[in-house]
């Protein structure tokens, strides 16, 4: 089971909320849209441990006005108990992520969509994406998952989605990647991958789209 004390012992970092997809105009579509689902107990709709690092790197590469960053919030409350559900998160969270992907495709049908998820947020993405239409899946050019809680169960991939469009980061010693819900210190150490390797992969996917 989850070690809540260890999870909450991580020093507090500023959380972030981003809603450019929700507020952006279809008349000013960006170079890419980045949709991210935070980990359990993280505040805002982006969290602070992973998502903002990747978002900031994409903005540095393309310019802030050329990247819409959108966190999965609302019905996705990122509670701890939802990790124990069969999908590793709630159906409401999955539907909310799907709504955002569909919104991106309808607002900006020619814009490459990228996405990411951390911990429970990785489960949100791995459940949401397979349920999208083929057209929307095709518009998703790259997905990065960190501390993937369904990594073992899903064979190290997003079901029914190209592995060439997916990169999964699992730190040595992060036991959630081995099919458990045991939180070890390694589960909190993805900032480097989020800041460098993940955006590098996403940029390559965007630029080749």
From Swiss-Prot:
Q: Which Pfam families match?
A: Cutinase
Disulphide-bridged cysteine pairs: 29-108, 170-177
Processing after translation: The 2 disulfide bonds play a critical role in holding the catalytic residues in juxta-position; reduction of the disulfide bridges results in the complete inactivation of the enzyme.
Gene Ontology CC entries for this record? extracellular region
Q: Where in the cell is it found?
A: Secreted
Q: Where is this site: Transition state stabilizer?
A: 40, 120
Keyword Heme: yes or no? no
Class of enzymatic activity (EC top level): hydrolase
Q: What biological-process GO terms show up in the record?
A: carbohydrate catabolic process
PROSITE patterns documented for this protein: CUTINASE_1, CUTINASE_2
- Is Secreted one of the keywords UniProt gives this record? yes
A GO molecular function for this record? cutinase activity
State the coiled-coil residue ranges: none
Write out the catalysed reaction.
cutin + H2O = cutin monomers
Q: What is its EC number?
A: 3.1.1.74
Which UniProt keyword terms apply here?
Answer: Disulfide bond, Hydrolase, Secreted, Serine esterase, Signal, Virulence
Catalytic site positions: 119 (nucleophile), 174, 187 (proton donor/acceptor)
The record, for PANTHER family, names: CUTINASE 1-RELATED, CUTINASE 2-RELATED
What family is this?
A: Belongs to the cutinase family.
Described by its record, this protein's role is as follows: Catalyzes the hydrolysis of complex carboxylic polyesters found in the cell wall of plants. Degrades cutin, a macromolecule that forms the structure of the plant cuticle. Allows pathogenic fungi to penetrate through the cuticular barrier into the host plant during the initial stage of fungal infection.
Q: Tell me what this protein is called.
A: Cutinase
